[in-house]
Amino acid sequence: MSEGGGRVSRIFAAPTRLCRWPALIECGVNLTQPLCEWMIQVARDRTLSLAWEVASLLTLSSSEVGLEGVGTIWPSSYSSEESSRNGAEQGRQLSIEGPFQGQNCPSHPAAALPLPMRGESQATSCQV
């Protein structure tokens, strides 16, 4: 394939398929293999950075962030045995233990929930 006359060279097309960004072809971006690999690495680094931010927040107690008595939302792995047993019945709703026991946390649309990693539960519970 030639690069002239609106055609795309193999060097241009292969990394574009790898990155799955067909819009870049329409914009006329000259996407090379090193550029594509760099873009993938930046995306991976950003994802890992966000994961670490969330993980560090999960280790904070309510008092450390000035939310005494409000409660803390924990992933299902931290929930009590009773909450785990009831998890199947609750579905995507959250349960509250402590001063707000018996009430339900507001439910969130499915699109707002992060997709669980392989082997991870979607159920989440609130604890104080």
From Swiss-Prot:
<dbReference type="GO" id="GO:0005737">
    <property type="term" value="C:cytoplasm"/>
</dbReference>
<feature type="region of interest" description="Disordered">
    <location>
        <begin position="77"/>
        <end position="128"/>
    </location>
</feature>
<dbReference type="GO" id="GO:0005634">
    <property type="term" value="C:nucleus"/>
</dbReference>
<protein>
    <recommendedName>
        <fullName>Saitohin</fullName>
    </recommendedName>
</protein>
<comment type="subunit">
    <text>Interacts with PRDX6.</text>
</comment>
<keyword id="KW-0963">Cytoplasm</keyword>
<keyword id="KW-0539">Nucleus</keyword>
